[in-house]
From Swiss-Prot:
Name the record gives this protein: Ribose-5-phosphate isomerase A
Native source organism of the sequence: Chlamydia felis (strain Fe/C-56)
Keyword Cell cycle among UniProt keywords: no
Pathway: Carbohydrate degradation; pentose phosphate pathway; D-ribose 5-phosphate from D-ribulose 5-phosphate (non-oxidative stage): step 1/1
Enzyme class: isomerase
Keyword hit for Chaperone: no
Quaternary state and interactors: Homodimer.
Lineage of origin: Bacteria, Pseudomonadati, Chlamydiota, Chlamydiia, Chlamydiales
Amino acid sequence: MKEDPYLDVKKRLAREAAALVTSGMLVGLGSGSTSREFIKAIAERLAKENLDICAVASSQESYSLASSLGIPLIDDENFTSVDLVVDGADEIDPQLRMIKGGGGAIFREKILLQSSQRRLILADESKSVKVLGKFGLPVEISPYGRSSIIAALEAIGYLGNLRKNSRGGFFITNNGNYIYDIHTPNIYPHPEEDLLKLLQIHGIIEVGFVIANVEVWFGYTNGQICKENTGIV
């Protein structure tokens, strides 16, 4: 496996984010490589400190890692509010609008973001882009009527492919749905407009755009961490 050139940056971001966690918190665990480092950093604190927390995970992968490291997890059906969610992103533009869902967990990730009192996105410098869309836009779609949903997408100019897994079959999300990766268009200067158009298609479960009140911490290979906030109410 190719070594991640930003692994040290992700670890540094994760440790600083883990320092925000205090006893009594319910913590939302995102998905992806940066979130994995955050989960590990939380586990390190639990091993060294008398920290009383619970967590809820946005994906089976994050759940399994947290469970294996001894992080207490709650029933993911019954939480109403999360104190802090820490997650990553695939792309972030200058307005801190972002694309998430490269790992296929966008539906659950957005529920956690919606439920959280504080939303923190950790990103290395490679995730900062001038315009969203270069690496594609993941859309979670229903298996029922799959072909008709894709036809509706194509009819309004959104072209792509169903995501495949490592065995060559269709990638299935933790919710039993498909991921359709849109590659055309490949730039989204006004993602709010695209989000509204896409959500009008019945059968689209969730779209990878995140336009919300979030904090974003950008980590750089020179050791700097730049902390920004959308300022959206």
